[in-house]
Amino acid sequence: MDLEEAEEFKERCSQCAAVSWGLTDEGKYYCTSCHNVTERSQEVINTDLIPNTQIKALNRGLKKKNNSEKGWDWYVCEGFQNILCQQAEALKNLGIGPELKNDVLHNFWKRYLQKSKQAYCKNPVYTTGRKPTVLEDNRSHSDWASEPELLSDVSCPPFLESGAESQSDIHTRKPFPISKASQSETSVCSGSLGGVEYSQRKEKGIVKMTVPQTLAFCYLSLLWQREAITLSDLLRFVEEDHIPYINAFQHFPEQMKLYGRDRGIFGIESWPDYEDIYKKTIEVGTFLDLPRFPDITEDCYLHPNILCMKYLMEVNLPDEMHNLTCHVVKMTGMGEVDFLTFDPIAKMAKTVKYDVQAVAIIVVVLKLLFLLDDNLEWSLSNLAEKHNEKNKKDKPWFDFRKWYQIMKKAFDEKKQKWEEARAKYLWKSEKPLYYSFVDKPVAYKKREMVVNLQKQFSTLVDSTATAGKKSPSSFQFNWTEEDTDRTCFHGHSLQGVLKEKGQSLLTKNSLYWLSTQKFCRCYCTHVTTYEESNYSLSYQFILNLFSFLLRIKTSLLHEEVSLVEKKLFEKKYSVTKKKSRSKKARRH
């Protein structure tokens, strides 16, 4: 279609009366406003071939679409492969070693392609009519050491480049050596081969790949490498655009055309949810039949002792609390290697929510020290305030009220900025998705109008330039002793809430209330329920603060706190259970 060549045609459109024409591949004029195609063709005068002769109504004839319009023949799995490659590169830029991309994620993806019968098998499911047979070689799926031999390159080259290949080579070469597609495969319903079939495919026992599943693959790879990134960190980096996720398809090579059913496959219009990605991680790990992951030991970043220290620093709590969190970890057995290590082939495959668990332990310690009943914490704050006024040269006691006031102000400011950033986020991609090539001009025109309106609106609302993407950081709050505007509580003492008894320290508070008195049945979809009105304001604030840090629902953190308490006060729960059983027996 050539708009410049159609400028000479000045007649009005019979449908919409507009004078805006373009040329089809057959040489006929069409209206760019309503897409009405006329019977008129372009008049071409060519005096070079036939002297003194005017040629009218020259039909250029049907011609094969050029490569720039049609693009490559590509499969859906190649699209997800490209997204995984983008995410792996982003993690590499964040400081993760290249082994995650070249070794771990590479092998996980190859294993998925084989187990889902899309590649690395004799007859890939999208290239022939019959179902392929996965190459077993009479070996166990869990034999990870023999996996490179098990995966023979039948229909798909390696996902990641070798040392000799550059990153640019991946985007310039055609990833899959695919034979000429049939008419049904190159349907206008999808830009990818088999896009319609993929969107309708429902096969029992097969984990269907989606864009959120790519984050599950990334987290599995990080967990295998025991990298210093938790699931909440990963999702926050996605939210801050450090890791491609929303509109990741716009970074596909130009030759990979997306339209039709590809919209539903690669288009994402919501932020990734912690619980959803967590479940998908277990689902993918189980489907791939992966062996037991490397042990999570005490020197590993994901161990609760290290994560507790990290989050204590994050929320400006005293360093002395770390001894108490370590004690809770030891008493509950949550620091044991077998408890922390992910084993997908175990009977009940599950992995620990490392970040949520660490935060829940801190909440339990705060309840042990201050009770958080909207009464005792303020009484202890009065004692700490009086002591600090009398002993200004000594190490200050931790004042819960002062900490609450400072943290609430910082939390409200941070949350407001976060909500504003979410409200201003541009969901529409720079590369619009459309259903067919007929809709392409309309889609790009709409996109152009949206961009212009956004520029005008931003000029009217805020004349200041929009801040650029902030650099990635493991911490969202920064507290230093040099900050004169905000008090740093890291070096404050817990003497006001602890008392000595022999060689040990005990809490002055001898009371404790359980977050959950009775857990839900095993067939229920949740462990416990959370209603804010049933709990103290102090407890609500603590949960809201940590939930914001991890970008999780408050109910999820409350559930984890209840599970920590169940392990810590196991005897108390068992006594309660026996009493309830005895009451039932008396009734009968």
Swiss-Prot record:
Primary role: Component of RNA polymerase I core factor complex that acts as a GTF2B/TFIIB-like factor and plays a key role in multiple steps during transcription initiation such as pre-initiation complex (PIC) assembly and postpolymerase recruitment events in polymerase I (Pol I) transcription. Binds rDNA promoters and plays a role in Pol I recruitment as a component of the SL1/TIF-IB complex and, possibly, directly through its interaction with RRN3.
The protein's name in its UniProt record: TATA box-binding protein-associated factor RNA polymerase I subunit B
Gene Ontology terms for molecular function: RNA polymerase I core promoter sequence-specific DNA binding; zinc ion binding
Family matches, as InterPro entries: Rrn7_cyclin_C, Rrn7_cyclin_N, TAF1B/Rrn7, TF_Rrn7_Zf
Keyword set includes Transcription regulation: yes
Localization of this protein: Nucleus, Nucleolus
Region feature B-reader, mapped onto this chain: 40-68
Chain residue ranges for the region called N-terminal cyclin fold: 74-261
Family stated for the protein in its record: Belongs to the RRN7/TAF1B family.
Region listing for C-terminal cyclin fold, in residue ranges: 262-372
Binding site for Zn(2+): 13, 16, 31, 34
Record-listed N-acetylmethionine modification sites: 1
One GO BP: nucleolar large rRNA transcription by RNA polymerase I
Xref: Pfam families: Rrn7_cyclin_C, Rrn7_cyclin_N, Zn_ribbon_RRN7
Subunit composition and interactions: Interacts with FLNA (via N-terminus). Component of the transcription factor SL1/TIF-IB complex, notably composed of TBP and at least TAF1A, TAF1B, TAF1C and TAF1D. In the complex interacts directly with TBP, TAF1A and TAF1C. Interaction of the SL1/TIF-IB subunits with TBP excludes interaction of TBP with the transcription factor IID (TFIID) subunits. Interacts with TBP and RRN3. Part of Pol I pre-initiation complex (PIC), in which Pol I core assembles with RRN3 and promoter-bound UTBF and SL1/TIF-IB complex.
Region of interest (B-linker), ranges: 69-73
Chain intervals annotated as zinc finger (RRN7-type): 4-39
Domain free text: Although it shares weak sequence similarity with GTF2B/TFIIB, displays a similar subdomain organization as GTF2B/TFIIB, with a N-terminal zinc finger, a connecting region (composed of B-reader and B-linker regions), followed by 2 cyclin folds. The RRN7-type zinc finger plays an essential postrecruitment role in Pol I transcription at a step preceding synthesis of the first 40 nucleotides.
A Gene Ontology cellular-component term: RNA polymerase I core factor complex
Key words of the record: Acetylation, DNA-binding, Metal-binding, Nucleus, Transcription, Transcription regulation, Zinc, Zinc-finger
Residue numbers carrying N6-acetyllysine: 440
